[in-house]
From Swiss-Prot:
It is found in: Cytoplasm. Its EC number is 6.1.1.17. GO terms for biological process: glutamyl-tRNA aminoacylation. It is an enzyme of class 6 (ligase). Monomer. Keywords: Aminoacyl-tRNA synthetase, ATP-binding, Cytoplasm, Ligase, Nucleotide-binding, Protein biosynthesis. This is Glutamate--tRNA ligase. Disulfide bonds: none annotated. Belongs to the class-I aminoacyl-tRNA synthetase family. Glutamate--tRNA ligase type 1 subfamily. GO terms for cellular component: cytosol. The gene is gltX.
């Protein structure tokens, strides 16, 4: 048997997600258990959304958890480069190879033509999908349009009938009718590959033997398997893990619970406990013990024992497990060092002291001034907002609109944060001083604090959003109907002036 090679391939387009860590953990344990290699590849073909800051946050977060990869963008390896943006010269030739073999074709349809196609399909009660119009062009027509410099994409051909059988390591045989699979774009008009082409090409060139990923990719598996067949390559073994769920069984979403690893790090969760908890997502030790280390998990790991029932990511259970680790796994000296590294690290002090120094008479003043920077949720109630000028309901609405704008931000620094809040206040016809007061309370527990955008920059996007969300709930939150009404108002507000800096 050849060497087992697995990978995690995150896109650096946002905060490092606990779901990424969960998939990475299972990939690493499977590879290590078989004496194989675990790779990290950055899938940053979406250059409008990908950022170096997000990539670094992903690497730092996974390392904080204790996950190490054998090959990757920061450690190198024999199959690099490990960023897709640095492999752009590779993908085009493979797309053209498929065209030459008759497995893919040029499509010159404009966005307007495709929109019209979808409208006509919907009018007939059909599911909108590409109708294969590019396949009707003759070779001469294609060449003529290429010579004329018309923009095009390259799409893969899909069987018109029959069933694709997917042999899944966990789920057995999965059947998907080819009629449900679209003629996927492989190469976009700007020459950039889509996820599907780049993913298959890279997995082959990096000799990945097992693709262990979330179940949301099951519907893409027919396209991927067909691409392997078209290229004449051996497909890797597929294994689709169940998605993490909220306690109400809904898909894990930052709208309901914090999903960023950085949030849990900022809250003071231990990396050992976090990794332990993720290891229990659909899997358990043979002896059913609650607590185990990464080394112990690797030793006993069996991918076939993963349960397909949606694993529940319950913050209360994570907190309980974290408390066990704190009480049972550390000496006083070790715990003192952890607390020092977490709360009194030099980086945090250097960010906080410029704001605290002018307000300090003695060193003991620092704790009450800056303690909120290393706290969890602020102990706010409706009374905490009573002294602010705006009515409580209007404060709550501003917090909700601010949260939506901040969730869409791609950069997190004080000037950008202030610009977002100022623009929102102007759109709502409010003075910035009045509008921003509830944000002060949400972030610091009081309006008597450091400049709020500086505080938000220090505690970071995950904790800032979580505290604002907590404050909204402390003010009573919103019912479903009110939430829908606010979404409509927010959309209109955004149209009034400068659009939020969103991830388009």
């Amino acid at each position: 048997m050849s060497e087992i090679r697995t990978r995690i391939a995150p896109s650096p387009t946002g905060d490092p997600h606990v779901g990424t860590a969960y998939i990475a953990l299972f990939n690493l344990c499977f590879a290590r258990q078989h004496g194989g290699k675990f790779l990290l590849r950055i899938e940053d073909t979406d250059q409008t959304r990908s950022t170096p800051e997000s990539e670094q946050a992903i690497l730092d977060s996974l390392r904080w958890l204790g996950l190490e990869w054998d090959e990757g963008p920061d450690v190198g390896g024999p199959h690099g480069p490990y960023r897709q943006s640095e492999r752009m010269d590779i993908y085009g030739k493979y797309a053209l190879e498929l065209v030459e073999k008759g497995h893919a074709f040029y499509c010159f349809a404009t966005a307007e033509e495709l929109d019209e196609m979808r409208r006509e399909q919907q009018a007939r009660g059909e599911t909108p999908r590409y109708d294969g119009r590019g396949l009707t062009l003759t070779s001469a027509e294609v060449q003529s349009r290429l010579d004329a410099g018309e923009p095009y994409v390259i799409r893969m051909k899909i069987p018109e009938e029959g069933v694709c059988e997917i042999d899944d390591m966990l789920r057995g045989k999965i059947e998907i009718e080819w009629s449900q699979v679209d003629m996927q774009v492989l190469l976009k008009a700007d020459g950039m590959p889509t996820y599907h082409l780049a993913n298959v090409v890279d997995d082959h060139l990096m000799q990945i033997t097992h693709v262990i990923r979330g179940e949301e990719w099951i519907n893409s598996a027919p396209k991927h398997l067909k691409l392997y067949e078209y290229f004449g390559w051996r497909a890797p073994v597929l294994c689709h893990l169940p998605l993490l769920r909220n306690p109400d069984k809904s898909k894990l979403s930052k709208r309901k619970n914090p999903t960023s690893i950085l949030y849990y790090k900022r809250m003071g969760y231990l990396p050992e406990a976090m990794l332990n908890y993720l290891g229990r997502m659909g899997w358990s030790m043979p002896d059913e013990r609650e607590k185990f280390t990464l080394v112990e998990m690797q030793e006993h790991f069996d991918l076939l024992r993963v349960s397909l029932g949606g694993p529940i990511f319950d913050v209360e259970k994570l907190s309980w497990l974290n408390s066990l680790w704190i009480r049972e796994n550390f000496t006083i000296e070790q715990l003192a060092q952890r607390l020092h590294d977490w709360a009194l690290n030099k980086d945090m002090l250097l960010q906080a002291l410029p704001h605290a120094q002018s307000r300090m008479t003695t060193l003991s003043d620092f704790a009450p001034l800056a303690g909120f920077l290393v706290s969890g949720m602020m102990p706010v109630t409706e009374a905490s907002f009573a002294s602010n000028k705006l009515p409580v309901e209007q404060q709550k609405e501003f917090l909700q609109f601010a949260l939506w704008r901040l969730e869409a931000l791609r950069t997190w620094e004080r000037d950008t944060l202030f610009a977002e809040l100022k623009t929102l206040a102007e759109q709502m016809g409010l003075k910035i001083k009045d509008a921003i007061a509830p944000v002060f309370v949400a972030i610091a527990g009081s309006t008597a604090s450091f400049p709020v955008v500086d505080s938000m920059q220090i505690i970071g996007p995950d904790m800032s959003r979580a505290r604002i969300r907590h404050a909204i709930n402390a003010l009573g939150g919103f019912g479903k109907n009110k939430q829908k009404d606010l979404e409509k108002v927010f959309a209109k507000l955004s149209e009034q002036g400068e659009e939020p800096a969103v991830n388009h």
